[in-house]
UniProtKB/Swiss-Prot annotation:
GO terms for biological process: 'de novo' IMP biosynthetic process. Pathway: Purine metabolism; IMP biosynthesis via de novo pathway; N(2)-formyl-N(1)-(5-phospho-D-ribosyl)glycinamide from N(1)-(5-phospho-D-ribosyl)glycinamide (formate route): step 1/1. It comes from Shewanella sp. (strain W3-18-1). Mg(2+) binds at residues 265, 277. The gene is purT. This is Formate-dependent phosphoribosylglycinamide formyltransferase. Homodimer. The keyword ATP-binding applies. Its EC number is 6.3.1.21. The lineage of its organism: Bacteria, Pseudomonadati, Pseudomonadota, Gammaproteobacteria, Alteromonadales. It catalyses: N(1)-(5-phospho-beta-D-ribosyl)glycinamide + formate + ATP = N(2)-formyl-N(1)-(5-phospho-beta-D-ribosyl)glycinamide + ADP + phosphate + H(+).
């Protein structure tokens, strides 16, 4: 049952994290009449602008997080970022609070160690070789054992912060320092992974719903500086590789438990598929689904967490997204060229309405459909290039 917002019978959902992905989740919740409460560490975050009300707290502060949940008494608590006091969510779930998809899934995926050990050691899924390191001495030993090239990531980071590829042993010290600076906790444990010389990488959006497990068409993407720049759907792949990918995604999602959409990241080399990471929430590369599917990843997530069925997912054809990236410092961001960006048929824009910028920041995304993937990517890139960010 869903009541009307602001009434006694309202269904209340609290978003922990109010960025561009949370904004789309908030919009989909509102389409189904859910009362939305946004929570983030800064004011006027994108999802706050479309929520019924919002709060600014440090979500890594266990007492502050518990206090806001106890104040609002939401029926659903939906983590949309990793930087949250997850142990508090575990405790509150045991007290009866509904954490999406589960508090365990949120805690396991908050850091790379929990999910990697689940995938490789508990589920026995194929992954790259890896070591976890607390000190620079352990780090250097791990590099010697794995060899170069190898990939270094903070155990806790997001959006590519602190990640680097070591191609020469002489880069080790710099990579260690960069990883320490990029971790969400201000330094600490890192993972050293063997470099998989993959042919391509995909995000397989996997939905756990009341009527079973569902898959979106695979999404290909290009990364730069640890963050995505373009994504496209569908990524061409053989039936054999797709079946392997779906089997891996199913095992991970079922092990994590709960209802919702999960972004499962996989490497593909030949006919082999390797597990990389998983997010128990919509994925940034999945922004392409705003134009590529009848139900976007955000609509699917909301249906699933509300316990609603998903009869089918229709994919419209070759589609792409291209990031609108800017660099500078301003709290008065404006945009020009929007008309030019929307001149081509089957193009759309999403401007995230972020309140400020200090450095490099993703401010929007261009979306396009065309006759084939290359044409869709080209159209999305062209559209994105026409949007001029004014400070």
């Amino acid at each position: 049952m869903i009541g009307t917002p602001y009434t006694e019978g309202a269904r209340r959902a609290m978003l922990l994290g109010c960025g561009e992905l949370g904004k789309e989740v908030a919009i989909e919740l509102q389409r189904l009449g859910v009362e939305v409460i946004g929570v983030d560490r800064y004011a006027n975050a994108p999802a706050m602008q479309v929520a019924h009300r919002s709060h600014v707290i440090n979500m890594l502060d266990a007492k502050a997080l518990r206090a806001i949940i106890e104040l609002e008494k939401p029926h659903l608590v939906i983590p949309e970022i990793e930087a949250i006091a997850t142990q508090t969510l575990v405790e509150m779930e045991a007290e009866g609070v509904n954490i999406i998809p589960t508090a365990r899934a949120t805690k396991l995926t908050m850091d790379r160690e929990g999910i990697r050990r689940l995938a490789a050691e508990t589920l026995g899924l194929p992954t790259s070789p890896y070591f976890f390191c607390d000190t620079e001495t352990e780090f250097n030993q791990a590099i010697r054992e794995i060899g170069v090239p190898c990939v270094v990531k903070p155990v806790m980071s997001s959006s590519g912060k602190g990640q680097s590829v070591i191609r020469d042993i002489a880069q080790s010290n710099k990579a260690w320092q960069y990883a320490q600076e990029g971790g969400r906790a201000g330094g600490g444990r890192v993972i050293v992974e063997g470099f998989v010389p993959f042919d391509y990488e995909i995000t397989l959006l996997t939905v756990s719903a009341v009527n079973g497990i569902h898959f979106c068409a695979p999404i290909g993407h290009r990364q730069e500086d640890g963050d995505y720049r373009e994504s496209w759907q569908p990524q061409a792949m053989s039936d054999e590789v797709l079946a392997k990918s779906q089997a891996i995604a199913s095992k991970v999602v079922e092990a994590l438990g709960g209802y919702g959409l999960f972004g499962v990241e996989l490497f593909v080399k030949g006919n082999e598929v390797y597990f990389s990471e998983v997010s128990p929430r919509p994925h940034d590369t999945g922004l392409v689904t705003l134009i590529s599917q009848d139900l976007s990843e955000f609509a699917l997530h909301v249906r699933a967490i509300l316990g609603l069925p998903i009869p089918n997912i229709h994919q419209h054809g070759p589609s792409a997204s291209a990031v609108i990236l800017a660099e500078g410092t301003s709290s008065n961001i404006r945009y020009q060229g929007i008309g030019a960006a929307l001149e081509a048929v089957n193009t759309q824009l999403r401007l995230f309405a972020k309140p400020d910028i200090d450095g490099r920041r993703r401010l929007g995304v261009a979306l396009a459909r065309d006759i084939d993937i290359d044409s869709a990517i080209s159209k999305a890139l062209d559209s994105a290039s026409k949007v001029k960010v004014i400070f």
